[in-house]
Amino acid sequence: MTGRDEYYNRAKQEGYRTRSAYKLQQIDADAGVFGPGNTVIDLGAAPGGWLQVAAEAVGPSGTVIGVDFQRIRDLESDIVDTIRGDMTDESTKNALRKRVNNSSVNVVLSDMAPNMTGEYSVDHARSVHLARQAFSVATDILPAGGDFIVKVFDGRDLADFRQDVDTEFEYVKSIRPDASRDSSSEQYLVGKHRITAPVSPGDELDATVVDIGSEGDGIIKIDGYTLFVPGVENGDSVRVRVTDLKSNVGFAEVIE
């Protein structure tokens, strides 16, 4: 039995709409994306296999919203909702924001793939274009700490796209699930812990130490964002260089 037949048959037997449902399960097992009560947005969600997996993962206290220009047949889950529209249209984004109802989004998913031409370079470029569209939506609606999963085909434009994702998240990992077909060049980039800091690594700025943390490092506040700086005292006015950023805090060093 081929891998394709195995996952296809399992999906039929276990009630999943697509064999790709197992890809998301395997990605979550590797990267630890979902948690109970999470709010999840699935872009290009038709026919709904990933919606099913996400709903199971977040449980009855969670919310899962699928967006697609195709109609998504209703699922037997009270926590799943769908929006029919183009995810790049502002009207669709507004409908999504309204449906989320000001709750924090925890995860944005995209398993979108282009219509295949058979020309590898063309198919790769189109897949990166779709991935960038999903990335744009994710950076628009994900708060600090949120996660992003996106499918993309391997090729020359992948490194630049991955670098762009890396600037918005604490780290990025590439996953190729066992459920992917052997003939496919697909992989999934997982951006973990969205960063929304008002500064970037390498930035230099003048600031005042407003407090001392539990580990003895000074605390600087930049538009509400915390930077830890070693070797300073409370009240010091210093010039610092940002060295590293996390979703909620960053680190800097004094410039001598």
Curated annotation (Swiss-Prot):
One of its GO terms (molecular function) is rRNA (uridine-2'-O-)-methyltransferase activity. S-adenosyl-L-methionine binds at residues 48, 50, 68, 86, 111. Residues 198-256 form the TRAM domain. Signal peptide: none annotated. Its main location: cytoplasm. Transmembrane segments: none annotated. Gene3D superfamilies: Nucleic acid-binding proteins, Vaccinia Virus protein VP39. The keyword Cytoplasm applies. The active site is at 151 (proton acceptor). Specifically methylates the uridine in position 2552 of 23S rRNA at the 2'-O position of the ribose in the fully assembled 50S ribosomal subunit. This is Ribosomal RNA large subunit methyltransferase E. It comes from Haloquadratum walsbyi (strain DSM 16790 / HBSQ001).
